[in-house]
Structure formats: structure tokens, C-alpha cells
């Protein structure tokens, strides 16, 4: 493969085939391409607009080069991030609830542009985010929950870290996280930062051997189920791709004020989650329940979103004990107790 020819093709706004994109991604991730050319390729892809085939090819490369673990029937609740609103880490909270009934392989990273990534909030809760594969399998067996830190499970990505940081713009790698779970989670609730990317990412997901994925983008522009209005969804299964639009009031609840969901730090997010689990923050609790409801539908545990919401109400009642179990087996209970104390007021 001639990298310069690939670059010329992208500059001419021609899409790569899946095999071309996969080969290119492997070369980049392995550090075989000079940084100046990596920068040029990432910018050219962004300016052209990443195609489905390019996303699929890059995702396959990242999956192949990742440290892998086997977690049958797992669900992930990862999103693309990048919506810029800084809401509480609802996907992480939902993952904890889901682990009461199903294996959860939560793939995530530290925040890049926001206040708190999934790694940050779990660390604030006392969780040890570096979990080697053998330990990960043990934790799944004992707790139904494991966090797979992207930087640890995709070690070759360090070869592009400097370029990405220097560029300071969204590149194709920013949207690959939810598609590259190291446990090959077959079920997923996937938040998407832009409504315009729902179609592209749903078509990409369809090519990547998921059982069922629900991609969501919610008003007022978040990569979660909307707390205030409409959520635009793509439901991807073996049967194809279905488009759905759903309003928060369809759960039988009122809209949730967005300002009540904003956080300033990982600790702030951790406190809000624990307060919701304790029944002390109704707004955040509702936000967690509506997102969990859609994830339950992705798992085929319920037949509709309203039923999922009712199930989530039961799950959140058992969330504090589950969180304690998760941290006690892989973390620092002292940190969790500190958060609990700060949440009790």
C-alpha cells in the first residue's frame, strides 16, 4: 500500500474500500506511517467526510489489534462523546444498573473535551480502572460488571496519541470507541454526538456483527436519550436498520430540566449518580432510568421502552448494593464512602 497514493485519493474526495481502510488503519496504529502523513490523512478524511467503509475498516483494524477478552452476551453503553454539554455520566450509571441482570463490558476513556469521562467518574467512585484480561473475566463472573479502559485495551493507539492531541480536532478515531469494544459486546446502547452521524454509524454498526445496537441522539444535542424532548434512534439488528423517534413524555414522565444534569467535575458526577441511587436526586434518577430503559430494549429484556422504564425503576432501587459490590471487589471502598457522605446531604 502506497500511503501517498491513499492521501491523494482522499484529497480528491474519493472513498476508500473497507480493505484499503483496514490496511491503512493497521499501518497507522502500528506506528508504521510518519506522523506528518498521519496528520494529513486524518485531516483529509475529516474534510472529505468519513464513509461507512472507512469507519468499518478502521474499526476492524482496532478490534484486531486490541487486547481481547471473551464476555458472552455482554452489553456496552459507550457513546461517542463530544456533545459539549457536560451532563452527568448517565451511560456509566446505566451500566451499573444493567449489571444487576446482564453481563456489562463498559468500554470507555477519560474525558477529552468534557468534564468527566467514564474512566474519570468510575475512578471518583473508587473503581480501579486498570483491569487486566484475566482479572476482567473474574470480575464479570463475580459481579457482571467490568470496565475496559480504552487506553489499556488498545495499547497501539499510543502511536497516534501525539498526532491527535496536536491536531486538536475530531478525527475518525473519536467515533470508533463505541464500535471497538475489546469484549466484542454484541449488544449496545450507543450515544452519538450528532444527529447527522446516526445514519452513517448505524450503517457501519450493521457491518460489524452486533446482535442489536440502538444508536441515540437526543435533544438538545446530546449523545444520550433526551431528558427534555425527542430522541432520534436507529435500531440495528440482524434484520436491518429501523428508524425511531421517541419523546421523553412517552415514558409517562415530564421533561427533565437539563440544568439539573450538568456536572463540573468527575467527583460532581459521582455524587450526582450516588444521590440518584439513594433516591435523593429525582432529576438525575429519571435521566438514568430513561437511558436504562432503552438499553433494556436493546437487550430484548422488554418489549417496549415504557416497559423498560418500569423495569429500570426496580433496578435503581437495588443500585446502591450493586455499586458497593463492584467497588468492594475492584476498588477503594474508602473513596466510595467519601462520595456517599458527600451525597447524603
From Swiss-Prot:
Keywords, ordered alphabetically: Amino-acid biosynthesis, Aromatic amino acid biosynthesis, Glycosyltransferase, Magnesium, Metal-binding, Transferase, Tryptophan biosynthesis
Chain sites annotated for binding anthranilate 1: 79, 109
Residues annotated as binding Mg(2+) 1: 91, 224
Enzyme Commission code: 2.4.2.18
Domain of life per record: Archaea
Binding site for anthranilate 2: 164
A cellular component term, taken from the record's GO annotations: cytosol
Binding site for 5-phospho-alpha-D-ribose 1-diphosphate: 79, 82-83, 87, 89-92, 106-114, 118
Catalytic activity: N-(5-phospho-beta-D-ribosyl)anthranilate + diphosphate = 5-phospho-alpha-D-ribose 1-diphosphate + anthranilate
One Gene Ontology molecular-function label: magnesium ion binding
Necessary cofactors: Mg(2+)
Cross-referenced InterPro entries: Anthranilate_Pribosyl_Tfrase, Glycosyl_Trfase_fam3, Glycosyl_Trfase_fam3_N_dom, Glycosyl_Trfase_fam3_N_dom_sf, Nuc_phospho_transferase
One GO BP annotation of this record: L-tryptophan biosynthetic process
Parts forming coiled coils: none
Pathway: Amino-acid biosynthesis; L-tryptophan biosynthesis; L-tryptophan from chorismate: step 2/5
Record's cofactor remark: Binds 2 magnesium ions per monomer.
Positions annotated to bind Mg(2+) 2: 223-224
Subunit relationships: Homodimer.
HAMAP family, per database record: TrpD
Protein family membership: Belongs to the anthranilate phosphoribosyltransferase family.
Function in brief: Catalyzes the transfer of the phosphoribosyl group of 5-phosphorylribose-1-pyrophosphate (PRPP) to anthranilate to yield N-(5'-phosphoribosyl)-anthranilate (PRA).
Record protein name field: Anthranilate phosphoribosyltransferase
Organism: Saccharolobus islandicus (strain Y.N.15.51 / Yellowstone #2) (Sulfolobus islandicus)
Gene: trpD
